[in-house]
Structures are given as structure tokens and as C-alpha cells.
Amino acid sequence: MNFQFYFLIKHNFISCKLETPLQLLLTTYVNLLKHKKNIIPLNVDKARDVYRAHENSYFLDHYIRSNQATCITQRPSVKLGEWVQKGDFLCDTTASSAGELALGKNILVAYMPWHGYNFEDAILVNETLIIYDIYTSLHLEKFEIEIENTNWGPEIIKLSDWMFSDKRDSLYGKELFTQETTKQTYVKEKQITIGVLKQAFLRRKGKLLINRRFISKIHKYEFLTNQRFVVPQFRYQQTLFQQINKNPKKQLISRSIIENSNQLSIYNKPKIRFTNNVISSKLFKPLIIFSQVTLLNILSQCHIDKSQYQPTSELLSSKLVAKEQIHELLFKQPKKTGVKIKLKHGTSHTTDFYNKDLLSNTKMRAGGENHRPGESKIYLGSKASVKFINMNFQEKKTNGYKKISLYNNKTSSQNNVNKKSFFLFLNKSILFLNKPRPKYKSTRPVNVSLNKSAFIYRRSFRTLFPYNFKNMRLSCEKLFVNNNNWLINYIKSLDVVIGGEIYRPGNKLQINLEYLNFKYGFVQKNNYDHLDNDGIIKLGTWVKPGDIIVSKLRPIGPHNPTPLEKLVAAILKKKFDDYKNAAFYTPKDVYGRIVGIEILEPKNLPSDVEYSGIGRVEFYLVDKRRIFVGDKMAGRHGNKGIISNILPKQDMPYLPDGTPVDMVLNPLGVPSRMNVGQVFETLLGLAGKYLHQHFKVTPFDEVYGPEASRSLVYSKLYEARLKTDQNWIFDPKSPGKTRIFDGQTGANFDQAVTAGYAYMLKLIHLVDHKIHARSTGPYALVTQQPVRGRSRAGGQRLGEMEFWALEAFGASYNLQEMMTIKSDDILGRTQVFDSILNSKPIQNSHPESFRVFINELRSLGVNFQSQILHQYNPNIKTKI
């Protein structure tokens, strides 16, 4: 809201009216000019007409951004009908009060040590300063997005129909299916079935990676109503989990990280029943939905080529997800065989998944080549041995997570039965399989490589490969055996096999697979809902790092598509896009609300060029920041410090009258720095608090007499003592000091403490602008050493004196790491992760700076040859 001043001039007197639209409606008659000799009652309209020529208007600024990205706001300091004259101030700004400079606040401070929290000028703060927003500041950030000219034309700001269709909400459980006819083939606009991913937005470190639709073609299906199934709610969080890829460098970082999965919701949606009795991989290519560590699995059955393989194991994947209780997600087919699922908090449900034709041709045999005692092999035959598997889920408390006990029931009379493998995914990302045979149980950890399939080869089966190529593969980090249960910990990424072939040339097994990899989780639906139809963020939207501000598209011109792009284009029946995504994202460590948007027209564009009508977009984002541990504060005497801790009000030291201290300062910061003025300020502020007086002390007041400052302070303290009848304000035995009580114990401290009101300021050096951490990051091009600075994600850099310290301590291994693999050893920093993961010794290498030094000598004409001697055999030499 803009405030406007109206000044009406009459006989050198100026009267002002602070006018807002609300006041114009409520105030119809106001006496603007009143004086002893000139009393002229006027209403607003008449005053404007009579004194139109002498009217001056001033508009106040609100939420203006300063050069330091702080907020400047002007507020009126005059009232309606008040007389003003030349030189009187009309309004205050953010940094003024009653026309005087005011950058801080008067708060109660005490100079005393407190459990070491004010070591080295650190500051202890009361939480009331945060609760009442005493030092809360507003920060305005400005972002500019320019429209650039490329060789293929100008960029455009818009929502692409290819990436952001109006029906994108159907992804998230709102409109998965249509029911136009009872039977229909695949329709492009209505393109999702259970387990088929419609559209995947993948994000890493705030950058949009892929905007493509992956659709599986279903030949024939029909719709049934009133079927309940689970649909994930996509909630994006910028965590380290989304930043992990197949690079072995990131494996060590993610060792101890186990992300909780996203919650699941239940919707009533139509059920799909396939017209085919067998859901084979030829007709159904399941693309699995994977959100962080939550896997929404689907029903899948193997398609086996009998001419090439005899030993086989049917992999049956049940779709079970646990939230607080385990909900079913199932298909139903009219068959006698099936799986009985007993829920702890519900009734039993029987699901019929089995391929009747396949089971009828399966029987168990023992013996044969490479047979172990007690091991069963599956061969294709004429008889079948069918069983019911009763999975009773019982919740147990083990190591803080839910544990599922899985056992078999209602088996046939035969000893050797056809066992199936079940994959159960809980909300703690724990995967359990059937128990292996007791004779072959193991307790040692088993390492699984990232690219190895997560379908476990049980010893009871002679399995060459998970034959369902069209199914999914899981990439995991750690596989171990616990209580005879296979357990996969921390599911890391998901590979979806979309094609492939398998054949056996001679006695060797050759497998060619083509798969998609989803590594980083999915972006939430709201990331695009806050954009308007033009692709620009809406005013008033709250944003966080990584959110899209402007959806900008950049022309890319002709290019050679990759095989994956050709596959996606063939599935979607789309032509290759002429634009690529160049969206602008909220920068790192930026939180706040969009409070201003300015759209400027483009310049210097040819008239025949089509553009979106936008040349530059400017955004203003406001952020409210309270004081926090690590922020810098200071007084008016150079007494600066960092906030070390924020204590509750009841734990802070308090005065004899029960007033808790707002801030505790280090008393050692006074004598050595010769700024005793802060002590006088504190005591005089205490006297002024109870006397309700405001003091202006002349600098160098000793010219008026010896010890003028001391005399003024003591006299005012004594006056305050007499006025309030509180003797602790001034004690003649220890003037300027008082007894302080401990807020935690209630006992008073042994020594008297200097306490009073001082003027403390919050500096612009905030911890949000300073804090920085890096594991691995960019390296300089020439020296190959970590770059410097927080803005460039710089790393740790050790200088000559730091190396001296390590040498003095004899930390040889740390010294080697700092000088080589953590600095500029290109080969060593790549091999060290492999050495740690595989429990191999770290090889010694040489830094890149040594190679640069040798090349500089050679550039000067000095031929310098160097060799590395072997650690144990000096005759073995290696050239550098």
C-alpha cells in the first residue's frame, strides 16, 4: 500500500494529511488548517479545489532493495492534522527512529563467563530475541533472466506442450484411466496403467535432467470399477539421495544414509483386467514407479524360451507396500492357485497370480549335473506340484525398524515343492526374500555390485539369470543375511529393462539388455503448478532451492538423436523437439517468497522473428531471517562476536528483580582492547531504563572535568536507586556491579557482575551466507587442485604452514592424503574409492603439481627426468 502526503500551504504554515484509500472512504470532513489567526474548516474535496496550486505530494517507498540485499521501508511519523514546518521530518526508514539513526536495539547484557559459551568473544543469546523478532530482518534478492539470441533463433519463455501438458495431473493418481469403451487399445492421451510410468522428471543438484515420457504399449485390456490400489504421492526433498549416481566416488558418501520412503495414499480407481490369461513380458513391459527409496512393484511373470533353457525359476513379484499397515495391491484372476496374504490389522485376501499353464508343466527333480545334496532343481515336465503360501506379517522391534517374519504354510505332501520368490518393500526400504535352505545359510556379508541384478539366486534353484528381461532390476549397495532372511539395505537406483535378447552360442550364455536407469527420485507435482500459463512463477509463491522460477526453452537446431531418444520418440509418436529445457531454478541457500515480478519487452530483435513477447524477467524474492547460531553481532565500540548458543529464557542469568538477561558477553573483551566506553554505556543505559531518560554524551567529555564519565554514570545510577527504591541498582561497595543469579540452579554467582542496557547491532555477516561443506567438487584446470571459494563449491586447501603442522605432529598418512588424493593426484583420487570399497591398499602416487613443475622446467630448456623407485625393490623403476 502506497502512502501519500498532501500539503496545504497557507501563510507559511504547512499542514499534512496522511491519506489512504480507506481513510478517504471513512473521513468525509477533516479540519486541515487550524491556527489562532487562521482557522479554516475544509473538507477533503474542497481543500483540493482551493489549494490545488499549493499542493505537494510525496510517496513513501516500501520494500525497496538496498545494495546489500536488505529491505528498505519508509513509515510515516506524522499524524493527521499535525502542523509541520521546514526541517521537520515526515517519515522514518528501516534504519531510523524519530529522525535519528537507529541500526540496533537496546537490550539487557551482562559481562560474565557462562560455561565457556562466550569464549573468544562469543555471545550467548536469549531465545526471547527470536520469539519477539527483535533482530529479525528482511532480505530482498533480485534475479534476472535474459532472453538470449542463438544461432537457431531467440529463446522463448513458455510451457512446452511436450513437457507440461494440461493432463500432467493424471500422473499423480487423479486420472489414471478412462472408461470410454469396455475394450480399447492404447490411447496416447490416456496412457498410464499400473506399473507404467507416464512421465518422469528427474532432478540432480537443482538441474532438470530428463523431461520425457516413458510409455508401455498394452495391446488389449478392459476396465473394471471399484478397485483399490496404491498410488504414490510425489514429495520432493533436496537431499543427498537425489545426488547419488553410479560414480564410485559417491558410494562412500551414501554408505550411512538411509532415506525414509515417501508416504503412500489409497485411491479408488478402476481396475484393469487383461484379456489374455497370461500376462507375459511380450505384451506387458512394466516400467516401475520409483520415488526416492519407495518401490511400487507390479505383477510380472516370466516368459521362458523352452528351446533354449530347461532349468528355470519363476520369479513372482507381489505388489505389497507397508505404511502403518500393509495394504494390498493386486490383480485377481479366476484361478485356483494363488497367494494368501494375511494382514495384521485386516482380513485375509487371496490373490491369484500364477500362470496355470506354466505350473502344470513344472515338476521337481533331484540329481543331475553339479547336484548338491538337498538341492532341488526345476525342470519342465508334465506334472505339477502346487502349494499355497501363507505369508503372515508380524511386526517385531529390531534395531529400530519393522521386521517381517515370512514362513510357508499349507504345502503339498511332497518334500520338494516349487518355491516362489516374493519381494516385499516396506516404508523403511527393507527387502525380504524367502528363507534359504538351512543347510546353506550364511552369516557373512555379501557384497553386490551396483550393476548386478537384485534378483537373488537362491541355492535351492539352479538359476542362470532372471529370465524376465522386461522386468526391473534393482541396484543396491549392501546385501547380507540376517536370521536366514536375505535383506537388501538402502535401495539406491532402479534400472528398468525395456528390451533385450538372450541366447547361448556354444556353452556360453550371452545376454544383451537395454534398460533405463532412474537414480535420483522424482520431482514433486507442485514444482510446475506454481507456474502460470506463460511459464513464469506466480506472485506470492514460496520457493526453496531448486524450484523452477521460469520455464525457458532454448532452440537447439538439428542434432543426431541417441538410441534412447529414438526409442522414446517412437513410443510417443513424437518428433524430436526443436527446443531444450533451459529453465531457471532458485539458487542454492535461497528461501523466501516472490514479492515482485517485472517483465520487459525484448530489444534488437528482427521484426520477422517470432518470440514470446518477453525480453527479460526480473524477480524479487523476500526472505525473513531470524538470528541464529553463527550470526555476527556487535556493539558501538568495536565489540563484535559470534552467537554461540541460544538458551531458553528460564536458563539465562537473571537480575535481582527477576529480569532475565538478553545477552551474555565476554568480560575479557574489555580491558585488553581499551574500549571501556561500552561499560559506561551499559551502566548509563541501566540508569536511563528506570529513569525513562535518553542521554546524549559528548565525546571526550573529560574536557569538562576529571572523570566526567564516571561521575555522570554513578550519579544517574544513584538517582535511579532512589527513584525505584531498588538498592541493587547502585551498591557503594561495588559501584556499577550487581549480584546475578543462575537461571538453571537459582543460586547467585560468587562475583558481582556488570549488567545493564547496551545498544547491540546485527551485522550483515549471516551464517546462511558463510556456511559451506564439500566432499568432492570442481578442480582447477591447470593445477588440478580444489577450487577456492564457497560460490564455486570450493574444497579444502592446505598451504605451506598447514603442511608444517602435519609434519610436526608426524601425521604421515594424513599428510600424504592432503598432498595427493585429496588435492591434485588425478589418478589416485579415482582409484582410492575402488580401493576402499574392495578392501585394497591405497597405492602411492604423485601429485599433479609435480608434473606441472617438471613441464615448466622443460619449457625453460631444462631436461628433467624423474623416476619412482619401488618400495621394496630399488631395481624396479617407473618413469613419471
Swiss-Prot record:
Protein's UniProt keywords contain Zinc-finger: no
EC number: 2.7.7.6
Gene Ontology BP terms: DNA-templated transcription
Keywords: Chloroplast, DNA-directed RNA polymerase, Nucleotidyltransferase, Plastid, Transcription, Transferase
Substrates-to-products reaction catalysed: RNA(n) + a ribonucleoside 5'-triphosphate = RNA(n+1) + diphosphate
Keyword Magnesium: no
Chief subcellular location: plastid
Class of this enzyme: transferase
GO cellular component, one term: mitochondrion
Transmembrane spans: none
Molecular function terms from GO: DNA binding; DNA-directed RNA polymerase activity; ribonucleoside binding
Subcellular location as annotated: Plastid, Chloroplast
Pfam family, one: RNA_pol_Rpb2_6
UniProt xrefs under PROSITE patterns: RNA_POL_BETA
Function: DNA-dependent RNA polymerase catalyzes the transcription of DNA into RNA using the four ribonucleoside triphosphates as substrates.
Subunit structure and binding partners: In plastids the minimal PEP RNA polymerase catalytic core is composed of four subunits: alpha, beta, beta', and beta''. When a (nuclear-encoded) sigma factor is associated with the core the holoenzyme is formed, which can initiate transcription.
Family label: Belongs to the RNA polymerase beta chain family.
Any further remark recorded for this protein: In L.terrestris the gene for this protein is split in two.
UniProt protein name: DNA-directed RNA polymerase subunit beta C-terminal section
Source species of the chain: Pleurastrum terricola
Higher taxonomy: Eukaryota, Viridiplantae, Chlorophyta, core chlorophytes, Chlorophyceae
